[in-house]
Regions:
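Aromatic-lined ligand-binding clefts that engage carbohydrates, nucleic acids, or primary amines
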Residues: 421-435, 464, 541-564, 571-572, ...
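Short beta-strand-plus-loop segments that form exposed binding edges in beta-rich domains
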Residues: 466-472, 596-602, 670-677
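Aromatic- and acidic-residue-enriched segments that line the glycan-binding/catalytic groove
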Residues: 93-101, 112, 123-147, 198-202, ...
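Aromatic-lined substrate-binding rim segments of carbohydrate-active enzymes
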Residues: 64-130, 202-210
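N-terminal carbohydrate-binding accessory modules
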Residues: 26-78, 108
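Active-site neighborhood of glycoside hydrolase catalytic domains
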Residues: 153-229
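Catalytic-core region of carbohydrate-active enzymes that cleave or remodel glycosidic bonds
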Residues: 208, 241-335, 339
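Aromatic, loop-rich ligand-recognition surfaces of beta-strand-rich domains
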Residues: 568, 632-638, 647-777
Length: 777
């Protein structure tokens, strides 16, 4: 009898399991995300994507759920996220999808709260992230061609995309998961034109994700057609205040029945070391989202919550070298530490109008904010305690040559007698300090384009030591192939000639916590209040309760911080960021450890303090960077105007074609009149064309002169590869306005390409312009 009952029970359970399986399969089959006429379709019904861009590595895992709930309460129905290759494969072939890298867990949390997910798996992501998400170890292959059909690069991309799909493809909507769209590459039009490469990435993703996922590619309105693939959804990226109709005009011509989506609507902007904190008006952002939704256009708000580029993950911008700060606050609706801003509350009011029901309540912060008294860091160890591998070479070796991704390299060599003044020249990536027999004699800072310094007369046998700290690798444009350390030779020039050292000792100094701990194992006690030497510093503080806080680093110089083993990120006394966000989930009751690696040494003693508020807008520059030196202005009456022209009003690119190609190094524009009759002038982007009508590379362009610059709207914004940023004069500055750009060398120029600001009406756009090409022969 028992046997009969046992079999009946098993049969009943089996039938029940089959019934449940069929139900799940039927439910899964009914879930789809597709493209309809003028709209996206979710399960066959019109669906407007209202996405919040958030990045899981920039948020402590303990706070993921809070940030997701904040996005939900804002009125968003989707999360948009990059998958960062270099955080998952920090060493070739060694993948990590655990802990704060568990992107699948992040997506499951989104689904738990009723949100869909858009996945952007690169391989390149930009995001003001180290090397745009590409792993540094790719550069160990010197001839590699990044973001092209280089065999080795494509093999590694294929492996990465396979591993990502293993984690995330089971979470696609076809399987009942939250993932509705997957992006192919990222803004490739701003990098180049290579449809075969973009097609190859698409094919990889199609192979890994199947044909039931919607693939799309994003670009700018000015370049999306260069790499547009016929079987992909096309989306546009643009920023606060942009003329939305103009941004989608070309797409509407080519695909009148396609759904419209702004895949990156930039809520603010990122900060760079040595420049003012960036902000964008709340009203302009909110009005833009309102207009977008009123027209049934989908969007992803980049960023809704920026978070923090912890550790060494902050990138750098180009042309030139402009390293990003640790904070990725982005002036977003949800600030760096998870609190709603005025942008949040204003946007929430608008989003409520487009919601099906009442929005969820805004969740409380997961922790209170705390502060502490000043903390003295009394333990000290010299930089040499952290030395790693050493190699001898006939040339300076880069980080990549030494198999080091991040940190500092120390180069030493012995000099012969060099009488008189000595000019040392080198291309150091990124911040180099120079010593003669242990005495500091100067520095070069790549962010200031410094490549040389003068040395005193050198005696025979003098030791030359160069300490080079690497900052974030460039994350945007062609300069992403960014080696660290000394790139090329070091030369020393005297009246008697040029000498190039050929006997170098190169020593690594990694910037990880393990190295810091090793260094401090042989520490000494110092007077923290008077400390000034480069090296490692450690101190402790006790807490009776934990909470979020901000570690004030103003007393220190330049380097990295670790609290209880967690890498908070880079600090630099020049600002604008002076505090580092310290999540309360990384603290504990009782004793907490602070370790500081300072490569230049404290400025005001070895001390820190936990504050209950951030300081991210305080500059401490030796001298302000200005470009209105009269010595750099146009020589009066000595130059011939190449062209006087009248520009058209309105948004969009215009070509200014010279009467004949001219050769020169400098491009000067003299603006005599603006379209609106006012004196304030603005330019979003400028390009030059060579004699064949091709765009001239701008990587070496620099500002020579600008008669006026308003705040962060400096002239370099006119050639920073970003169409949403711009040069703008002060409102009180009078016409005519003059700008001069140094292209780096003499070359033939046949035309200029000019882009006014993207906002409706193109505010500050020029009307009457004189063009001059001169110098460099």
């Amino acid at each position: 009898m028992k046997t009969t009952i046992h079999y009946l029970l098993r049969a009943f359970l089996l039938i029940g399991a089959l019934f449940c399986l069929q139900t799940v399969e039927a439910k899964t089959e009914n879930h789809s995300f597709t493209v309809g006429k003028g709209t996206f379709l979710l399960d066959g019904k019109p669906f407007v994507v209202k996405a919040a861009e958030v990045h899981y590595p920039r948020i402590p895992r303990a706070y993921w759920e809070h940030r997701i709930r904040m996005c939900k309460a804002l009125g968003m129905n989707t999360l948009c996220l990059y998958v960062f290759w270099n955080i998952h494969e920090q060493r070739e072939g060694e993948f990590d999808f655990s802990g704060n890298q568990d992107v699948a867990a992040f997506c499951r949390l989104a689904q738990k709260h009723g949100m869909y997910v858009i996945v952007r798996p690169g391989p390149y992501v930009c995001a003001e992230w180290e090397m745009g998400g590409l792993p540094w170890w790719l550069l160990k292959k010197k001839d590699i061609r990044l973001r092209e059909r280089d065999d080795y690069f494509m093999q590694r991309v294929a492996t990465f995309e396979h591993r990502v799909a293993e984690q995330l493809e089971p979470l696609s909507i076809a399987h009942g998961g939250p993932i509705i769209m997957v992006q192919v590459e990222n803004e490739y039009g701003s990098y180049g034109e290579d449809k075969p490469y973009v097609s190859a990435v698409r094919d990889m993703l199609r192979k890994e994700w199947g044909d039931k996922v919607t693939l799309f590619q994003c670009d700018w309105a000015s370049n999306f057609t260069n790499n547009a693939l016929g079987d992909l959804v096309w989306t546009m990226n643009f920023g606060t205040g942009a003329n939305i109709d103009q941004q989608f005009h070309r797409l509407g011509e080519l695909r009148p029945d396609a759904p419209k989506m702004c895949s990156e609507y930039w809520s603010g902007w990122f900060d760079k070391w040595g420049a003012r904190h960036e902000t964008r008006p709340a009203k302009a952002m909110v009005d833009g989202i309102n207009e977008t939704l009123s027209k049934g256009i989908s969007f992803s708000l980049y960023m809704t919550h920026g978070g923090t580029s912890f550790g060494h993950w902050a990138g750098a911008n180009s042309p030139g070298f402009k390293p990003d700060v640790t904070s990725y606050d982005y002036d977003a609706p949800i600030n760096e530490y998870g609190q709603p801003t005025q942008k949040y509350w204003q946007l929430r009011e608008v989003m409520q109008h487009y919601a099906d029901g009442k929005l969820p309540a805004v969740p409380k912060a997961p922790m209170p904010f705390i502060e502490t008294p000043e903390i003295s860091l009394a333990e000290y160890a010299p930089l040499s305690n952290g030395f790693g591998n050493t190699r001898s070479s006939d040339r300076p070796l880069t980080f990549e040559d030494m198999d080091m991704g991040w940190g500092t390299m120390v180069y030493t060599t012995t000099l012969p007698e060099l009488p008189g003044k000595v000019a040392l020249a080198m291309d150091a990536h990124d911040y180099a300090q120079v010593y003669l027999d242990g005495k500091y004699v100067g520095k070069t800072d790549r962010s200031l384009d410094e490549k040389s310094l003068m040395l005193p007369a050198v005696k025979n046998g003098t030791q030359l030591k160069i300490v080079v700290e690497g900052m974030g690798r460039i994350n945007f444009g062609r300069a992403i192939k960014d080696y660290k350390g000394i790139v090329g030779d070091v030369t020393l020039t005297t009246d008697q000639g040029v000498w190039t050292p050929r006997q170098w000792t190169c020593t690594t100094l990694p910037d990880d916590y393990a190295t810091a701990t090793k260094a401090l194992a042989n520490s000494t006690t110092t007077d923290g209040g008077k400390a000034s030497a480069p090296g490692y510093y450690r101190g402790y503080f006790k807490l009776s309760k934990v909470g979020d806080t901000f570690l004030n680093m103003e007393a220190f110089g330049k380097g990295q911080v670790y609290v209880n083993g967690h890498a908070l990120g880079r600090f630099w006394h020049i600002g604008p960021q002076q505090t580092l966000y310290l999540p309360g989930c990384w603290l504990k009751k009782g004793r907490n450890e602070v370790v500081v690696l300072d490569v230049v040494g404290p400025k005001d003693g070895a001390k820190v303090q936990c504050l209950n508020h951030p300081v991210i807008d305080k500059l401490n520059l030796e001298k302000p960077v200005k470009h209105n030196d009269p010595k750099m202005a146009l020589p009066k009456g000595k130059l011939k105007i190449a062209l006087s022209t009248t520009l058209k009003p309105g948004n969009g690119w215009q070509t200014i074609r010279l009467k004949e190609p001219l050769r020169g190094r400098y491009i000067a524009l003299q603006i005599g009149e603006n379209q609106n009759g006012k004196s304030q002038t603005a330019i979003a982007e400028l390009y030059a064309q060579d004699e064949h009508g091709k765009r001239i590379n701008r990587d070496n362009w620099q500002v020579r002169y600008a008669d006026s610059e308003q705040g962060n709207h400096t002239l370099d914004k006119a050639f920073d590869l970003q169409e949403s940023t711009y040069w703008q004069t002060d409102a009180k500055a009078t016409l005519p306005h003059v700008i001069i750009i140094d292209t780096g060398k003499s070359q033939t120029i046949s035309a200029l390409e000019y882009l006014p600001r993207q906002e409706q009406g193109a505010p500050g756009s020029a009307r009457q312009v004189d063009v001059l090409i001169f110098g460099g022969e």
